[in-house]
Curated annotation (Swiss-Prot):
Sequence ranges assigned to domain Clp R in this UniProt record: 3-145
Stretches for region NBD2: 559-771
Encoding gene per record: clpB
GO term, biological process aspect, one: cellular response to heat
Keyword entries, A-Z: ATP-binding, Chaperone, Coiled coil, Cytoplasm, Nucleotide-binding, Repeat, Stress response
Disulfide linkage: none
UniProt lineage: Bacteria, Bacillati, Bacillota, Bacilli, Bacillales
Binding site for ATP 1: G205, E206, P207, G208, V209, G210, K211, T212
Alphabetized InterPro entries for the sequence: AAA+_ATPase, ATPase_AAA_core, Chaperonin_ClpB, Clp_ATPase_C, Clp_N_dom_sf, Clp_R_dom, ClpA/B, ClpA/B_CS1
UniProt-recorded name of the protein: Chaperone protein ClpB
Family assignment from sequence similarity: Belongs to the ClpA/ClpB family.
Stretch list, region C-terminal: 772-869
Amino acid sequence: MDINKMTYAVQSALQQAVELSQQHKLQNIEIEAILSAALNESESLYKSILERANIEVDQLNKAYEDKLNTYASVEGDNIQYGQYISQQANQLITKAESYMKEYEDEYISMEHILRSAMDIDQTTKHYINNKVEVIKEIIKKVRGGNHVTSQNPEVNYEALAKYGRDLVEEVRQGKMDPVIGRDEEIRNTIRILSRKTKNNPVLIGEPGVGKTAIVEGLAQRIVKKDVPESLLDKTVFELDLSALVAGAKYRGEFEERLKAVLKEVKESDGRIILFIDEIHMLVGAGKTDGAMDAGNMLKPMLARGELHCIGATTLNEYREYIEKDSALERRFQKVAVSEPDVEDTISILRGLKERYEVYHGVRIQDRALVAAAELSDRYITDRFLPDKAIDLVDQACATIRTEMGSNPTELDQVNRRVMQLEIEESALKNESDNASKQRLQELQEELANEKEKQAALQSRVESEKEKIANLQEKRAQLDESRQALEDAQTNNNLEKAAELQYGTIPQLEKELRELEDNFQDEQGEDSDRMIREVVTDEEIGDIVSQWTGIPVSKLVETEREKLLHLSDILHKRVVGQDKAVDLVSDAVVRARAGIKDPNRPIGSFLFLGPTGVGKTELAKSLAASLFDSEKHMIRIDMSEYMEKHAVSRLIGAPPGYIGHDEGGQLTEAVRRNPYSVILLDEVEKAHTDVFNVLLQILDEGRLTDSKGRSVDFKNTIIIMTSNIGSQVLLENVKETGEITESTEKAVMTSLNAYFKPEILNRMDDIVLFKPLSIDDMSMIVDKILTQLNIRLLEQRISIEVSDDAKAWLGQEAYEPQYGARPLKRFVQRQIETPLARMMIKEGFPEGTTIKVNLNSDNNLTFNVEKIHE
């Protein structure tokens, strides 16, 4: 027995047989040990053949184990188990060797062991019974005319079934979603496949536009016989390149697998069309020192027309891999797959609607499909239709399905309340005082009411769930019947087709309508139901908002109120700048109502004015109002961009420079957070060439970064602040605080001297901030003191400042040329520092209120007014 004349699988089975003998303490390797090991081998051909012959493999394996247990085990020292081969096991190998010669093979393989076991082993004979001829046929089919010329022949057996999937068969079994549209591309593919030579189309398009769907559409047409005669008997196999490469342990094993696949395709005489998704992976696949890659192995067959192949890849990968190999490129014919428009996407979604309804057990409204196409096109800019729209619908269905499986919010709240009351009840039962007894009585009454409410809600939920389950079951039956109708029509089974089309399907549709009507009558409108089973455009909007951070869902009442009073909210934080506040809040309201220009940012403003009048504060307060946090503001200090080359930091370093992979500070921030306030602070400090980058943002709402990716700025508010013309404003402002026309012209003259006309012309508005008046200062004092009180709240201390003291603070700190900042410093010196000293010295208890007054000497006095109990 020469172990080197056996395949790796047989060698592995013998090794496992030795281990089995050691476990059973047997000196000899028995035939059952070898056969049990062969049956349990990973990816066992022995097991695979028996399973296809409908042999009970588990029972056969148990029979082998039982037989092994009947052999006498040997106990003792220095006994070597599994060192010898039994007479019957030796006969098995000898007989297998004779089968090897009969098949004209070079190595003993698993099928030889199986044939030998069928002749020699009584246990195997008993289970195989009268299926010997069936097994012989299966072995013949699996081998496919191949000879065992290597120690790993299994890779050559049924290579296509192992490393690919039959798309035509999947269509017949109804496993594939329908393909809607793409008729021109499918026809183009069919034309190329019908050529004599170079009949290999390659589908090129962006990720998610439907390249794989075109091949699935071709498979569906083949099943429906809606193809030219030359393609009627064809089948489409999708090659799984990762499976082809995975587990190829030995040198040349990958090439052997690929050759086996290509041999099957070639021997099919053009009946098999090979589909290779991500075909660029062929270039370089399996490449080792001195070995050919997969691409070079395909070239001869492609050129001769022996291999019918459809490839699919993206534009970038085609350029990077295929175009570089011109010999491979010329053997393929390009089919460009463009992104469908919104109307085509809606048609595709309508075609898929029923499949998703049946899978998720929900109802999808048509307006949800329209919203998915339109919103994904407008807001999800880094992906392509129809993929992103289909994902939206799928996610929305999954969301509703998840909600259906859990308790509604109303019932959940009641359950929590009941649990809370029960815990309180058990605690009060241990108390003996009158107050506790009184509370216990009240609590038990409330608990009884809550339990009654809980039972009613639970009953209603169960009823709705039962009716929804009936609807889901009926929809699934209808879907199965429609699939059966397609199969019957394809197979020309007219009697069955007529029965389904005119009997079963109309009856199921009628029953489904009745169930839906009853459900509608009993449960009322969708909004009245405890459990929602309908996907609407609101769910689609919510998911777009989750993915992008852009609020596109319908306005809820709280948000509606917030938007209508946005200017009031901003006025509380920004004092004395009514025009600026109104302009910014109006821009946000226009955008949220959906009537802004969809190709430009929400708003772009240039704020001009002296320092400390609220330019930056307005941007911060806007971010806080819209997003409940100032962190959503992208702040770029333009004083960092004083050099001409600093523009690369905004959009990213060019190729070859350090930091190219990191992206730009502005572009990456907006890509991560497309709905935000962008504050370009102190723009006059930046180099003038930096503003050329802003031209595209302000006009088209987009910017291309250093990697060539387009970043969407259409949902941002761009605010620039500058001190240009502030001296003119300070010198010429009226006593009322109004800015005169001549002052405005003088400021604009200063502005035109600094900014290019094309920048200024693209701004929505240039807003002049007026210097702060004495009246404004008193309001700012209130604001500063409110913030101080918020900080003191943590220590349970509060401060009250008299009106006289407030007026004095505003008057003393008033410096028009510096705005509100001197006031903040003045309050720090006059109130915060003395207060801090008192707190450290005296250590106020919680609940202390400190009153600040102004005495006759114009000095502030601090008195501890009261202590709350």
